[in-house]
Amino acid sequence: MTERIVLAYSGGLDTSVAIGWIGEATGAEVIAVAVDVGQGGESLETIRQRALGCGAVEAYVADASDEFANEYCMPTLKANALYQGHYPLVSAISRPVIVKHLVKAAREFGATTVAHGCTGKGNDQVRFEVGIQTLGPDLKCIAPVRDLALTRDKAIAFAEEKGLPIETTKKNPYSIDQNVWGRAVETGYLEDIWNAPTKDIYDYTATPEFPPAPDEVIISFEAGVPVAIDGVRVTPLQAIKELNRRAGAQGVGRIDVVEDRLVGIKSREIYEAPGAMALITAHKHLEDITVEREQARFKATVGQRWSELVYDGQWFSPLKRSLDAFIEDTQKYVSGDIRMTLHGGQAVVNGRRSETSLYDFDLATYDTGDTFDQSMARGFIELWGMSAKVASGRDIRVAGK
């Protein structure tokens, strides 16, 4: 029986060429797998037909946009996950759901190997292969760009020689990855970290220097999940899309950062994540009034570690699963409404309300009639500062000898 290889297929030049390239290099039949995570663009049927036209014996296509929003974006939101304080894990969280469907397709079509189009310098090779090893430990992995020396020049030449139904061009100097949670742009002139991004690289966001009138929005949450916008019930996917549209029109969510890659190098990245950044901002402000202080402090540490694990391709790891359980427990009372104004590249919260709020007006007010007993403060301060006071006394005593 002829060996079968499942290929993570985007519909672009590199993975279209990889179908024939893998076939010639290995003699195997190739099954193309395309997964919709809300990236927009061409229809799944168009992509399926292109894969078949490029030589795939089967084409598996899956609309995973709701699955991605519910099972991957929402945990990211609950964690307030920003890798190194900036990056909302746009590409990192899409890889596990793609891996899930790659392994599913491999089982369905009797494949023994999974292929992806990642280079040997990026994070995605790790995310794909660690995920595949975890969900399908018997499956082998190959990476044509990395393992079979498939360069872009070779890809163009191969496509033209074979007459493949795919556009061949060297025009676009950027590497772009996008889904409903955001958009990532790298390489080209951006590799000189002194170069400012030009307007042409942006697609999800309008120029914030010339915004339309301010847009006020009310986002309602239940247990950490957005459930309504301006009183209209929405699914997580609908919430992200609506805020992509509204926050994007105001230039919200542009990120220019140099980050530490898993493989040990620093990389300059441009991200657009208008919906994600608006939602994370709103969610964090709701947590500020609903999550107890010590729990909130520790959750910030957990969220940072969660972000690192996901960035590093450990979505399916035991530690990440344990952190998920802690984060989920913190969301029990994260329900209520956040009002924010979107304008000029900013998402500014100016109102919050919750039936499970820990904010007590009578305790917090400085007006007459407050219920805070200030007479307790002196004793509290004495006890709170006791340890430092005793240590200071020792320092003075030792220094005087």
Swiss-Prot record:
L-aspartate binds at residues 119, 123-124. It is found in: Cytoplasm. CDD domains: ASS. This is Argininosuccinate synthase. Disulfide bonds: none annotated. One of its GO terms (biological process) is urea cycle. Its EC number is 6.3.4.5. The lineage of its organism: Bacteria, Bacillati, Actinomycetota, Actinomycetes, Micrococcales. The gene is argG. PROSITE patterns: ARGININOSUCCIN_SYN_1 (PS00564), ARGININOSUCCIN_SYN_2 (PS00565). PANTHER family: ARGININOSUCCINATE SYNTHASE (PTHR11587:SF2).
